[in-house]
Amino acid sequence: FGGDQLDLILPGDPRFKDEAVALRTLAEQQDEFDERCAELFEEHDYYVKNYGMEKIWYMQWGNHEYKSRVVTEGDMKRYCKMNNMTFLGSKAFIRLDIQYKGKSMMKKTLFVNHGAGGGGTLKALENLTVNCEADVYQMGHLHDPMGVKRDTFFYNDKKNSWDSKEQILVNSGCFTTAVSNNVDQWMEQKGNKLQTSKPGTWTISFDAYQQKVSQHG
């Protein structure tokens, strides 16, 4: 979970419009989220208790949570603890070690960042690579799911020479639509460009045998 799990555009927020909102309180939105994710949480809990592994690698919070003034960092940590999840704030590094029979087959570094601000999605993804070294960069703030695979140079000690490696940049997306029936909502009023993205997944695959990382959505 990369943040903005909850909408939290509540009364008092300049974007709030009563006719456009079905769930008006934190409790209602939290209950809806828990209900939709119940099956996933049960599977995650089973993996943790029986195999010591996390099905859900992490949960972050996004601007919809940390700017809401109704959810604190303590609330997020407590919620994650209750559900056997790891809370990673808004930015974090993850070190992935894929093993087979106790032997390390592939190690990759992931930089996960909820994201902030507006602008073009590709530029936002490229900005993640500034001052941060990783193999996979993931964000979710912008309402435009997309993925990019590219090569980057590095010095390979095993070859004692320069080399190149793959990098994956993914905006897993916060799904939205800028049009609603019978109500003129905030996203229709804010500008000329309408946004829409359907719910779905963006998949990153790690092939330890071929030492390849790929993405598709």
Over which residues does each language-model region extend?
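Conserved beta-sheet core of the metallophosphoesterase superfamily
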Residues: 1, 106-110, 115-213
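Core catalytic region of metal-dependent phosphoesterases/phosphodiesterases
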Residues: 1-88
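Short regulatory "switch" loops immediately downstream of catalytic or recognition motifs
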Residues: 38-47, 93-101, 142-156
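Short helix-terminating capping/connector loops at secondary-structure junctions
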Residues: 46-54, 105, 161-165
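Short, well-ordered helical secondary-structure segments
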Residues: 81, 97-100, 127, 191
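Active-site-proximal loop/helix segment associated with metal-binding centers of metalloenzymes
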Residues: 84-90, 96-106, 110, 174
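Polar, enzyme-active/binding microenvironments
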Residues: 217
